Amino acid sequence: VKVTITAPELCPRYIAHYVKDIKIGPSPLWLKRRLALCGLRSISNVVDITNFVLLEMGQPMHAFDLDTIEGREIVVRRAFDGEKIVTLDDKEFTLNRENLVICDGSKPAALAGIMGGLNTEIKDGTKEVLFEAAKFARDSVRRTSRSLGQHSDSSAIFEKGTNEYTTERAMKRALHLIEQLGCGTVTDVCADVATEYSDTKVKTMTVSPEKIDALLGIEVPVEDMEDILKRLNFGVKRSGNELELTLPRYRDDIFAYPDIAEEIIREYGYELSLIHI
């Protein structure tokens, strides 16, 4: 399986994993129930796995019938002006260069981050599946979704932003469920493409507890700050009068002092800060 990304600014990361010996059938009762409780109907074991991972981990996934992928090649690119695609809900769209598409060797197979194409859907006779987990630029998904009037659970999540750590974990979770449900054989064939826009570096920050206290308007013991941040999976090391922090890989929402202060006060207790106001 070959993956090529020609629009790296719109797709920083793309993971594709090949699963063979697929046995399409109904999902077990526990999976049907969990989907139903979230307002989703059960479709088939393979499709249900992708929907379950979306709900459980907040990472949209997609499954392609590999026999419909020409040349067993995935190309992530901008659509050509006038290019057409029919999505899984049987709607036809005319595309332009503002739209990002997942293609095989010759044609679009999915609207990136929004919905798969009808020509590559999972059917009862599907024997080979290519699972997709990716990170798409939120602005790109938003523009395409709004310009085409095509919205989905996946587009709603991508528009808010996803992170690559969750992308990796979601793929592993989906493959684990394939094995757990016994509906396919997970192979070692995997393409994991990280572009120059990929961001997998460990993020660090150095903060002053004194400045945190000034922001909060109360004095939080340094030991409590350390304990709270460690419980939130931050790496914490005391260096003189400062704390050196290593941010969890899945926390893309932490940028500055106010973000750290918010994490601390939420755990320490807003009611305690009110006493001092």
Give short role names for the model-derived ranges.
Residues 1-274:
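RNA/tRNA-interacting regions in translation and RNA-turnover enzymes
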